[in-house]
Amino acid sequence: MTLKKNDIVNLTITSATAEGSGVGRTDDGIAVFVQGSAIGDELKVRILKVKKTYAFGKIEEILVPSKARITPDCENFMKCGGCTWRHISYEEECKIKQQRVEDAVTRIGGLDNVVFKPIISSDNITRYRNKAQYPVGLDRDGNVVTGFYSFHSHRIINCTDCILQPEIFARVIEITKDFIAKTNTEIYDETTGKGRLRHIYIRIGEVSGELMVCYVVNANGLKQEDLLVKMLKSELPQLKSVIINSNREKTNVVLGRKNRTIYGSDHITDTLCGLQFKISPFSFWQINRKQAEKLYGKAKEYANLKSDEILLDLYCGTGTIGLTMADSCKQLIGAEI
C-alpha cells in the first residue's frame, strides 16, 4: 500500500526519538513518527507528511494506552516546545534515555561487552530549574505574551507558570507585564527588528535564595527603569540584582555583550558541592543544581584522585568540576580557550 497524506493507519509504538516522538511501523515497514505517543501505545494515526522511507503522523485516537502513559501535568504540553516527556512516567523517560545511550555505544559506536550502569535519577522532576529565558512578543490581537517557543518554531506560547521553574519566576513575569502595561513599553518584533523589550531572563541561587532579573532590550535601556525596580522590590524581598542587557543585533542569540546594573549587584551567589560561586547573566551554571552535585560526586569517585596527583581540568569553563575535586589532589590546573 502506498502511504499518502491524510491516510489513517493503526500503529503500535515500539521506540522513541530524542525529541520525544514515538515510532511505529506500518505493515509495509515504513517508520511513522508520532509526537506525543508512548512506547506501547496502540494508536489510530493520521498521516501528515510522507517521505521516501518514513512518514510523520498525529494521534487520531488512542486505542490502547501504554502502561507508561500518564496525564500531562502541564496545560501547555504539546503546544510549548520546552518539554517532550510530560505524558509518560519519569521511570519510563529514564528507561528510554538509557536505551539511547546503549544504542549509541553498541550500534553506532560498534563497541561490545560494555557494562551499562543504571541512570542516577533526579529526586525532583518539577521546580528544579534555576534559570529561565522568556521571549516577549505580541499575539495576533496585540496582547503581550511571554513564555516559550512552540515546537520547532519562534511562535511564543504564553506560559504564566512553567512547572519546571520556581514559582517566584511567575511572579516576576506578572510584575513585568504590569510594568509593560503602565509604561506602554514597546515589544520587540524579531521579523522587523523593531521594538524594545526582547527577553526576560531570570536566575535564582537555590541555596542563597538570591534573585536576579535581567531584561534584554533592543536599546540602551527601558523607559522608567526606576519604576520597574520599585515594582520588583516591593514584592520580591529576595531580589539581589536587576540588570539591563543590550542586544541590538537581529539574531537568535538571546544576550548581547553589554550589561548595565540598575539595582543591587551585578551577580548573585549559589553553592555547589560546598563551594560558593558568583553567577552573572553570562555565567555558565548547571540548571539542575542538585543533580549536578550527584554528577560531580560520581565523577570525583571515578577519578579516584591521590593526594600527590596534579589534576588538569581542560576546557573547564567556570571550573566547577575541577574545583569540587581540588581537595583530593596536590594541584588543580584549569585551562579554557
Model-derived features: positions:
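Accessory RNA-recognition modules of RNA-modification enzymes
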Residues: 1-337
